[in-house]
Amino acid sequence: MPLLDSFAVDHTRMQAPAVRVAKTMNTPHGDAITVFDLRFCIPNKEVMPEKGIHTLEHLFAGFMRDHLNGNGVEIIDISPMGCRTGFYMSLIGTPDEQRVADAWKAAMADVLKVQDQNQIPELNVYQCGTYQMHSLSEAQDIARHILERDVRVNSNKELALPKEKLQELHI
């Protein structure tokens, strides 16, 4: 099985919160696609709570689009990582990490402005697979955590696992 890009970086050295370009590619028509690792938590030390990350998933996607789409950028998808330490964001375009970090912080400020669980988009049995598994207060705790610590940039060059380590891990 081929080694996925996300497993070629050293998770023990990742900073959080931080933005990292996880992958870049071009479509057959030449459009640039960038996948960002938006790392909310330090891997293996912190984790976002289940209900909070789910609520954040509903809010974050719209708020990030409000702040990042335009000027050659269009978000395709924002999805939580299975390890619950962050989100992957796929988009058309090549914004720099600082632009993404600024949009992320603005989106977190928007999360803090949501006053009632009824304001969470698609929070109903028809549009959500686990519509009762939500917590606005947990999502807002996550947002506060990001804004209190600021957002850094994780460099692939600094985080790359050496070939020797990959061989040692039998990858």
Swiss-Prot record:
Enzyme class name: lyase
Catalytic activity, EC: 4.4.1.21
Molecular function terms, GO-annotated: iron ion binding; S-ribosylhomocysteine lyase activity
Record: residues binding Fe cation: H54, H58, C128
GO CC annotation terms, alphabetical: cytosol
Biological process terms in GO annotation: L-methionine salvage from S-adenosylmethionine; quorum sensing
SUPFAM superfamilies documented for this protein: LuxS/MPP-like metallohydrolase (SSF63411)
Name used for this protein in its record: S-ribosylhomocysteine lyase
Gene: luxS
